Amino acid sequence: MKVSFDFDSTLSEEKNQKLAKKFIDAGHEVWITTSRLSTEHGRSKGWSWIITQNEYLFEIAEKVGIPKDKIKFTEGEDKWKSLYNFDIHFDDDDIEIELIQENLPNCCGVLMYEK
């Protein structure tokens, strides 16, 4: 299975990191798909805060076992446009989940949030 996790308020949470590790341990391909701007984009604009912010994302990705080439920065675009050929995507944003359900019939969008 090809599985994707949003980062902020999703894979940044310890319990979801454990879930991602379980998918990896079971042999599934796990990605991070985030609306964040890429480090390269931040560097080109001179926005050092993006570089610092993404260091935390890379740290968590390494901890979980997700290589850098399996991290997709959508640069603010709707995530569904980056999730063709994915089976499941976990996100805390209900609008992103709705867009996945509307546009990607073969991808299951799962809403993850704390009440």
Q: Residues of each region from the PLM?
A:
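Alpha-helical substrate-recognition element adjacent to the catalytic core
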Residues: 1-74
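A short acidic, amphipathic alpha-helical/loop segment
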Residues: 15-23, 82, 96-103
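Generic alpha-helical hydrophobic packing signal
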Residues: 21, 66-67, 80, 106-109
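A structural micro-motif
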Residues: 28, 69, 87, 106-108
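Noncatalytic linker/hinge segments flanking ATPase motor cores
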Residues: 44-47, 77-84, 110-115
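Conserved Lys-Pro-Asp/Glu-containing loop-to-beta segment of HAD-superfamily phosphomonoesterases
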Residues: 71-95, 100
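Asp-based, Mg2+/Mn2+-dependent phosphohydrolase catalytic module
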Residues: 93-115
